[in-house]
Amino acid sequence: MATRLDGRAVSKKILADLKQTIAELAQHDVTPTLAVVLVGSNPASEVYVRNKQRRAEDIGVRSLMFRMPEATTQADLLAKVAELNHDPDIDAILVQLPLPAGLDEQAVIDAIDPDKDVDGFSPVSVGRLWANEPTVVASTPYGIMALLDAYDIDVAGKRVVIIGRSNIVGRPLAGLMVNHDATVTIAHSKTRDLKQLAKEADILVVAVGVPHFIGADAVKPGAVVIDVGISRGADGKLLGDVDEAAVAPIASAITPVPGGVGPMTIASLMAQTVTLAKRRANG
C-alpha cells in the first residue's frame, strides 16, 4: 500500500520554520510584505485570498490587500502594479487570477517587477528557471518539490511524466524536475497513447482537473503519484485527478486529495515571500 504524502503535516513544519525565520528578520527591522491585488469578486478567488491572508497573519508576514472593482480598466490595473513595483516596503506582488473578462492577464503578469514576482509567472522568472538560475517559481510546483524532498524521494535519474502543460503547474514543474536531473515528459490533450506513457513513469504528476482521470491501469507498480487536481463530485465531495482507492495498492507513494498538494501551495507562497524579503534586506 502506498505511503500517503501528507501535505498538511509537511506544510505545518514549513510554516513553523518560517515563523522562526520571520522573528529573526524582525530583529533587523525586516518584515516580509506581500501585496495581493484582487479584481472583482470571483468566489473561488475570495476563498484563496482569504486563506493566504490567514496563513500570512499566522506566521508574521504582512499581507496587504488591494481590492479593485469588476469594471477596473487595463490602464488602472497596470497603474496599480506600477505603484506596487515602486513601493520599497513591498517584497512580493501577487495578482490573483483569473482576472475578469476584458483584462489582459499576460500584460499584467509582464508588468510585475521580476524581483517581486512571487508567483514566478513573469517571462524573466520563467527564463531564469529554464536557465537553472536562482529564481522564484510558481507555488504549486515549488510545493510539490518540497513535499517530495520531505519524504526523501529523489527525482534524479527518474522518468517523470507530467500530465498537464499549464503555466501554473506543468511547465514550471518540468523545469524544476529537469534542474534536479530528472528525465521529463509533458503530456496533454493531444498526446497519443497517454495511459501507456503514464505507465512508464517512475513519478507521475496529474494536473488536468478531471475527477479520477487516472486509474490503476495507467500506473506502474511502485510509482510515486502526485495528484494536483481538485474537483467536486455530484455529492459535493472533493475529488482528485487520480482514483486513490484504485491506485494506492500499486503505487509506492501518493498524495491524497484533499491534504496533499493543496496545503503545500500556500506554504510555498509564504516561503518565497520570505526569500524575496531576505533579498531586499541583503540589498
UniProtKB/Swiss-Prot annotation:
Task: Enumerate the HAMAP family for this protein.
Answer: THF_DHG_CYH
Residues that hold NADP(+) according to the record: G164, R165, S166, S189, I230
What does the record give as EC number? 1.5.1.5, 3.5.4.9
On assembly, the entry states: Homodimer.
* GO biological process entries: L-histidine biosynthetic process; methionine biosynthetic process; purine nucleotide biosynthetic process; tetrahydrofolate interconversion
Q: Briefly, what is this protein's role?
A: Catalyzes the oxidation of 5,10-methylenetetrahydrofolate to 5,10-methenyltetrahydrofolate and then the hydrolysis of 5,10-methenyltetrahydrofolate to 10-formyltetrahydrofolate.
Q: In which pathway does it act?
A: One-carbon metabolism; tetrahydrofolate interconversion
**Stated name of the protein:** Bifunctional protein FolD
Q: Catalyses which reaction? A: (6R)-5,10-methylene-5,6,7,8-tetrahydrofolate + NADP(+) = (6R)-5,10-methenyltetrahydrofolate + NADPH; (6R)-5,10-methenyltetrahydrofolate + H2O = (6R)-10-formyltetrahydrofolate + H(+)
| Protein family membership | Belongs to the tetrahydrofolate dehydrogenase/cyclohydrolase family.
Task: Give the top-rank taxon of the lineage listed in the UniProt record for this protein.
Answer: Bacteria
GO CC field: cytosol
* Keywords noted in UniProt: Amino-acid biosynthesis, Histidine biosynthesis, Hydrolase, Methionine biosynthesis, Multifunctional enzyme, NADP, One-carbon metabolism, Oxidoreductase, Purine biosynthesis
Could you tell me one molecular function GO term of this UniProt entry? methylenetetrahydrofolate dehydrogenase (NADP+) activity
Does this UniProt record's set of keywords contain Amino-acid biosynthesis? Answer: yes
Give the originating organism: Lacticaseibacillus casei (strain BL23) (Lactobacillus casei)
